[in-house]
Amino acid sequence: VSIKVESVVPETPQDERYRQYIEEFFGARVTPRREIQRGEGSGFIINADGTILTNAHVVANAQKVQVLLNDDRALPGRVLGVDKVTDVAVVKVDAPSPLPAVQLGESKSLRPGQFVVALGSPLGFENTVTSGIVSALSRPSARLGIADGKVDFIQTDAAINPGNSGGPLIDTQGRVIGMNTAIIQGAQGLGFAIPIDLAKDISTQLIKQGRVARAFVGVKMITLSPEVLQALQRRGVSLSATAGVLIQEVLPDSPAQKAGLQPGDVVVKVGDTPVKDGTEVQNAIEKTKPGQTIAFTVNRQGTLTPISVRTEALTNQAT
């Protein structure tokens, strides 16, 4: 489906100063400017009742949402929930009859080289189909310049352009395996999609409770890369571990502190899985529900020590 939105752009500080200047010197009452901003994107119906999956950046802050179906019907939509961290949103339309819904697949079994098709409305051209392959997997948000994001994207060379955001990425069986989300401006053949497994989990929470519950551990960490090890050595810091994830700081009264994690500990395993960088630890935390326990194995001054941390609900942007 194609999604069109309208939002009100608030008055800028420059606009306010100009308005105050006119009112002061001319005695005229000036109404604050309310500029309507229009945008568009794509989405796909995941339930015959009119539940639609799209990107958060398409509908966030929208005062009006209109959904254009493939049969040219235009229906008003309402936003059920938005998660800016993963860029996933859920929109609902009320249709007089059941709507055709897509078949959701799985992204965990994807492999580079698989053939995929991207659907959407790039630059306003509805029902556009482009094809390509899965170029790579697990591209972290930070690599795309999305500092606050927590997504390991699917990379594809299927053409994705502005307006494709929120549209489905489909495999050869017609199953949705990703949601088209991002491009790198000026680059050719670099498109990115949110794995459908993540989108399904986030959308389920948004539909049920309107928000996403995230686990909180309470540490600041850094990957023990060769560059980090060299920098530590120059500062006179000696570690018994040469690989893993260094705990730099443990936040006061956090689950990590209560469990006994300490600055200087090096995380080498989460559960039974060895970890080599901070992204792997972060992903493990992301997959954990608040109140569940995460089993860490840390290297503490040469001794492998198991520490179990009972997570709490995240109330800020800590890890």
What name fits each language-model region?
Residues N70, V270-V275:
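Short strand-turn-strand beta-turns centered on an Asx-Gly dipeptide
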Residues G264:
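Conserved catalytic motifs of ABC-family nucleotide-binding domains
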Residues K269-V270, K287:
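Conserved amphipathic alpha-helical interaction elements at protein-protein interfaces in regulatory
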Residues A259, V267-V268:
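Short, positively charged, low-complexity/disordered linker segments
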Residues S2-A243, Q248-P252, A259, G278-Q282, ...:
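Serine-dependent protease modules
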